[in-house]
């Protein structure tokens, strides 16, 4: 038998916990300066930030701070920082632009991780035209 409490508990909406990165919410991380944010990131990202971003990286950060919501970029090596959360980036994967909306879970990752340059190919049955290597398969 199912009690009334369990029926009511099943109807209650799930409470979504606020995302935290190393114990800090995104709002708290946005208040920190660049060196304090870098201290929270893994070593490779921390090193890149401490050695300063290049001119193109600074332009991208300025565009984000200016309030642009959709930004096209080739900078696949840009680290996603807390102030970039909520911005939609169109990242070039070598062939086309992939639209990626940044979420709090993406902080500390590179933009290029979310616009893959390769994809797996699923071929049809073997035979003429299936792949380049199977062009010369003798017909039965």
Curated annotation (Swiss-Prot):
Keyword RNA-binding among record annotations: yes
Family matches, as InterPro entries: Ribosomal_uS19, Ribosomal_uS19_euk/arc, Ribosomal_uS19_SF
Function comment: Protein S19 forms a complex with S13 that binds strongly to the 16S ribosomal RNA.
One GO molecular-function entry: structural constituent of ribosome
UniProt cross-references to Pfam families, sorted A to Z: Ribosomal_S19
GO terms under cellular component: cytosolic small ribosomal subunit
Keyword rRNA-binding: yes
Gene3D superfamilies: 30s Ribosomal Protein S19, Chain A
An individual GO BP term: translation
Family per similarity comment: Belongs to the universal ribosomal protein uS19 family.
Keyword tags: Ribonucleoprotein, Ribosomal protein, RNA-binding, rRNA-binding
Protein's name according to its UniProt entry: Small ribosomal subunit protein uS19
